[in-house]
């Protein structure tokens, strides 16, 4: 069993990429449903606030994302979204029977801008949470950022540069994002170590086309 937690930016700066984000996410889900093994899916969409549209649903029961779910507005309360999701999933794992805790848990965070609206969590709090989850429970975190220095921003969260990547925030870049995310998820679900070149295709796209 693998637990997948998607934390996706839908702030106003994502305007114009709604259909690309929805299509990329749904394509990724469709591919994952064809893979062997069980998985639970949580999806958090954030702007000024966070909206949980899937809360630990079995993968095969996750409905496609629609424009009623993903619409852009507001600012970027990234820390609140990440902190809230870790707190929620962490508490469930803490109080679950050992046999009910997924073997692997993976958080995938995408944003096209810096934090600017959180009220409940700050960087230090979230960094401590992430470092604790990685060290004690082996959780995996990926950070995909556009229009920012993704490695530098991820480091403030306690996420290493090897798990962070800058992407091109346009139609092609968004589609590639979800292809690469799907490949990374496949590796984790198959209990294979996530290789250092998981982000190679995104890096090459940015080198070719720029940020």
Model-inferred region functions:
Residues 1-211:
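Acidic, low-complexity intrinsically disordered regions
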């Amino acid at each position: 069993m693998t637990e997948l937690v998607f934390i996706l930016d839908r702030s106003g700066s994502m305007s114009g990429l709604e259909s690309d984000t929805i299509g990329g996410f749904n394509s990724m889900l469709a591919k994952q449903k064809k893979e062997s093994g069980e998985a639970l899916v949580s999806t958090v969409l954030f702007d000024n606030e966070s909206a949980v549209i899937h809360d630990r649903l079995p993968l095969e029961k996750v409905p496609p994302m629609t424009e009623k779910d993903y619409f852009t507005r507001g600012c970027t309360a990234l820390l609140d979204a990440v902190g809230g999701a870790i707190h929620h999933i962490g508490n469930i794992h803490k109080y679950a029977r050992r046999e009910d805790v997924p073997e692997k848990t993976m958080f995938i965070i995408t944003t096209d801008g810096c934090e600017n609206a959180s009220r409940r969590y700050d960087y230090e709090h979230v960094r401590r949470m992430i470092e604790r989850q990685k060290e004690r429970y082996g959780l995996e975190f990926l950070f995909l950022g556009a229009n920012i220095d993704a490695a530098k921003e991820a480091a403030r969260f306690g996420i290493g540069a090897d798990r962070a990547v800058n992407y091109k925030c346009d139609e092609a870049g968004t589609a590639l994002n979800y292809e690469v995310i799907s490949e990374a998820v496949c590796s984790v679900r198959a209990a294979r170590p996530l290789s250092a070149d998981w982000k190679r295709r995104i890096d090459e796209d940015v080198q070719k086309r720029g940020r």
